[in-house]
């Protein structure tokens, strides 16, 4: 089996040739870069702290366990077509409906499972962020992934610290509520000073 790089200091390969049952922190291959500053992934990877691990694609079977019990099976994450490998993800404008249906990704917020969702619902704080999307989903154990998330967030350059362990489900929330929750989470002292 081909082994991934030992660290995130160089350009990472793809997961297409790997079939890993358990992933380590240096084996996550969903990375971001500043789409305004860099035109391509290679230039960003050569920058100091250019690679930032923020998540991993999963292939969830209908019988697999989930840290959040919803009483119904999780859907299978679909594989991406080659033409969908790279996208500029922004809160606005939303991606086309075809992309929303065919691109599924699992996000993590600290130690909490968020859910499999379309790319159009990427968190608003990730504006002007481009994500390198791998074509194949990776089976992994939830327990191992939950242990990797805090370390992965610390590798994320120039991000504000997470102030809450709980993230509400924004799938059906109005945009105004989402913005208010994000502002409140990042400015807790401003609210207390106002009272």
From Swiss-Prot:
Substrate binds at residues 121-122. One of its GO terms (molecular function) is carbonate dehydratase activity. Pfam families: Carb_anhydrase. It comes from the Eukaryota. One of its GO terms (cellular component) is cytoplasm. Gene3D superfamilies: Alpha carbonic anhydrase (3.10.200.10). InterPro entries: CA_dom (IPR001148), CA_dom_sf (IPR036398). Belongs to the alpha-carbonic anhydrase family. This is Putative inactive carbonic anhydrase 5B-like protein.
């Amino acid at each position: 089996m081909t082994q991934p790089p030992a660290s995130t200091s160089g350009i990472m390969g793809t997961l297409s040739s790997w079939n890993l049952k358990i992933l380590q922190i240096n084996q996550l291959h969903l990375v971001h870069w500043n789409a305004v500053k860099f035109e391509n992934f290679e230039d960003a990877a050569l920058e100091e702290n250019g690679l930032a691990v923020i998540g991993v694609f999963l292939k969830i079977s209908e019988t697999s366990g989930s840290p959040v019990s919803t009483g119904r099976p999780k859907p299978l994450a679909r594989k991406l077509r080659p033409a969908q490998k790279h996208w500029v993800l922004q809160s606005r404008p939303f991606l086309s409906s075809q992309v929303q249906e065919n691109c599924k990704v699992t996000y993590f917020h600290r130690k909490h499972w968020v859910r499999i969702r379309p790319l159009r619902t990427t968190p608003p704080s990730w504006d002007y962020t481009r994500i390198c999307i791998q074509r194949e989903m990776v089976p992994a154990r939830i327990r191992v992934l939950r242990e990797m998330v805090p370390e992965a967030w610390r590798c994320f350059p120039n991000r504000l610290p997470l102030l809450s362990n709980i993230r509400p489900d924004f799938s059906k929330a109005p945009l105004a509520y989402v913005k208010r929750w994000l502002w409140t989470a990042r400015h807790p002292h401003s609210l207390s000073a106002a009272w």
